């Protein structure tokens, strides 16, 4: 009798377990299909990882919409926030972080989100908020995605660590050192960099000079590099959310302006605009010997000038470390699929994925937990003459000091860039152009 009772109980328990596991009755329903829309620019979202995530989640479609940076982070996002319609994820470039940190209500506060179990098997634990992941990233890069109300708007994708890409063959032809350590010692300061450019240009033939060849692709690129080596830019952190405008009193601004003017007037640049067809052609034909190259630009050079493999190398930036660019992936407050978007970001920007992206596309990780990892430090790039790019860029990034970014930072940058352009085109003297810059900035402030 006892055996019979146990037998019946076992059948009941087993049947319940089978039913619970979905092995009896109606088969378990597959996860509902979801389309995550992503607004981005450039190569922030990499196709290799998109496919990898698709393999993990066949039910999820990642719909990528690329736009130019300024309309994306400007009018497009303003319209989306105002109408409360738009994507599930938006890439916000650091030049716009000061602006959008002023409008945190346009974003989901990722402190209040928790990862689901969707990516546990891929190494992302469930139940984690943004603050649980904060320790993985460079503190100053993390802060660029924090709203003025302390909400977490987004995770950092990369750091635009800045160094000098140079053509070994062209340096040799000009009688300059070619080994990366010796090259870096040529220019401990920006003045020495300019002097090296003058020396390089003096070795060019009359035909090369007539063809517009020069030392650096565009001397105007010195401005941003020098500005980002300071501790302040256009705003001072005075304890308020907005900060105090110091664009007209900060000595770093005039130092960057004056040094860039000096380089321009010394004629070390070719005056070819970056990201133009002439720039791409110039990479292939040796029109210029150096580019101030953030880590993410390495892949661009590879794509545009594949036949120059082994001819390029990477040397230290004058004046110490540097940074140019970087992005946050954010979830708008009106996102239709906020949970799926947050799960994707937590996976996509995990250190493991950031390392893959660096090795494949050159975007240097914002995940500082990798900076002592041999997988990063020992990585060498064959295209760049086997330069230890992991070590070079990590050392440079660690020298960068955090800079307080205000709401109008991008607009002020654009006004100063226009001013430098007028001088380069010989439309104005440096003094008159600077006076016009101040007028233009005041218009932006008062608008």
PLM regions and their residue ranges:
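Extracytoplasmic/periplasmic solute-binding protein
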Residues: 144-158, 162-164, 172, 189-245, ...
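Glycine-centered hinge/linker elements that transmit conformational signals in sensory
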Residues: 194-201, 238-273, 302
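Short, solvent-exposed loop/beta-turn-alpha elements that line the ligand-binding surface or hinge
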Residues: 111-136, 181-186, 205, 214, ...
């Amino acid at each position: 009798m006892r055996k019979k009772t146990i037998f019946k109980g076992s059948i009941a328990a087993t049947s319940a377990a089978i039913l619970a596991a979905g092995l009896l009755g109606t088969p378990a329903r597959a996860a509902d299909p979801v389309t995550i829309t992503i607004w981005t620019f450039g190569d922030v979202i990499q196709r290799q990882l998109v496919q990898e995530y698709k393999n993990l989640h066949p039910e999820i479609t990642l719909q990528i919409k690329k736009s130019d940076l300024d309309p994306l982070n400007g009018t497009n996002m303003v319209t989306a926030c105002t109408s409360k319609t738009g994507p599930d994820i938006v890439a916000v470039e650091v030049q716009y972080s000061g602006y959008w940190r002023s409008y945190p209500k346009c974003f989901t506060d990722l402190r209040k989100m928790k990862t689901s179990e969707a990516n546990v098997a891929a190494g992302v634990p469930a139940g984690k908020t943004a603050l649980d992941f904060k320790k993985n990233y460079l503190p100053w890069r993390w802060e660029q995605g924090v709203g003025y109300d302390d909400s977490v708007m987004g995770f950092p994708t990369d750091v635009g660590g800045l160094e000098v890409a140079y053509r070994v063959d062209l340096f040799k032809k000009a009688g300059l050192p070619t080994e990366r350590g010796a090259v870096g010692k040529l220019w401990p300061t920006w003045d020495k960099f300019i002097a090296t450019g003058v020396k390089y240009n003096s070795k060019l033939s009359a035909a090369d000079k007539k063809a517009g060849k020069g030392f650096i692709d565009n001397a105007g690129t010195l401005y941003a590099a020098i500005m980002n080596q300071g501790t302040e830019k256009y705003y001072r952190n005075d304890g308020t959310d907005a900060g105090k405008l110091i664009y007209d009193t900060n000595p770093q601004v005039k130092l960057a302006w004056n040094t860039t003017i000096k380089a321009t007037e010394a004629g070390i640049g070719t005056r070819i605009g970056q990201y133009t067809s002439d720039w791409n052609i110039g990479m292939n034909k040796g029109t210029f010997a150096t580019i101030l190259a953030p880590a993410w630009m390495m892949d661009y050079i590879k794509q545009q000038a594949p036949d120059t493999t082994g001819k390029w190398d990477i040397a230290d930036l004058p004046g110490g470390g540097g940074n140019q660019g970087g992005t946050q992936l954010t979830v708008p407050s009106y996102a239709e699929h906020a949970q799926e978007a947050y799960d994707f970001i937590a996976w996509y920007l995990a250190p493991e994925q950031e390392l893959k992206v660096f090795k494949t596309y050159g975007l240097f990780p914002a995940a500082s937990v990798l900076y002592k990892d041999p997988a990063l430090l020992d990585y060498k790039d064959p295209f760049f003459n086997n330069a230890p790019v992991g070590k070079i860029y990590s050392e440079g990034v660690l020298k960068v000091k955090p800079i307080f970014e205000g709401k109008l930072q991008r607009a002020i940058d654009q006004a100063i860039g226009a001013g430098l352009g007028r001088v380069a085109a010989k439309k104005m003297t440096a003094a008159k152009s600077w006076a016009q810059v101040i007028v233009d900035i005041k218009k932006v402030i008062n608008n």
